Amino acid sequence: MGFLLIGITVSAIAFSQNDSTIRYFPWQTTHYFKLGSTIIQLKQFEYGTNKNIVMINLHDDEITAVDAANKVLQNTGGILIKIENKNQRLVAFRLNKRQYKFDPNRIFSRSGIIATLKKNKSYSILAVKQIQAFASFVIKKIPADTKTLIAVHNNDEERLSISSYQKSGNYEKDVKKLNIQLSEDPDNFYFTTDKNIFYILSSLRYNVVLQENEKARNDGSLSVYYGRRNMSYVNVEVNRGQLERQSEMIKVLIRNQNKF
């Protein structure tokens, strides 16, 4: 188990020919982590010198989310951290001639790691320890002074929506407060650990879920990790393919960041 770091410079600032709008191009750094005999890449894109906006993407099949984050950061500056995984949701690795698979948004607690390994029929104590080290590796790449971590995710039709958090929904016990706008697509919503963010976004008439930080199931998700530590986190969850909508919802967060 181990890692090394390689930095690749691809940084620049450009101005539009039609106006004075600044466009940032990222400085890309690739961090490598050896999980069993498999090398996992964690990429970090830094747009300009703005460290106040930090985003993360854990599922490499959620391409719209990454495209939306990059599109916004070109204008605002900031940081995007993402797992590179050949456009696959589950991370696979080999350990002692056996293959393991896990959901990278279920690795931030021991119970979450065990559950995701068993779900994918690939559990062992040694694999749990390896993934715990990888989770720590990911957390350490998030700047320690990040005020609010912005996660970007995509869902598919009928897989996850704001309705999943209503009474009788799959995740109703994880919810402290819920704001549903009937005029909004139920697949598009914010999910946050921060009550201030919840109230601000609710007042702007978006679908918003406030996590029950103390009682939410410790499923290994990054939201629960942040919630248990009273840290500010917000996920921008949008239906796959809705690039403009996800970009707009990210921009809303950034425009209101000074109110959080």
Name the predicted role of every residue range.
Residues 1-18:
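Bacterial Sec-dependent N-terminal signal peptides
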Residues 17-260:
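Structured catalytic-domain cores with a bias toward divalent-metal coordination
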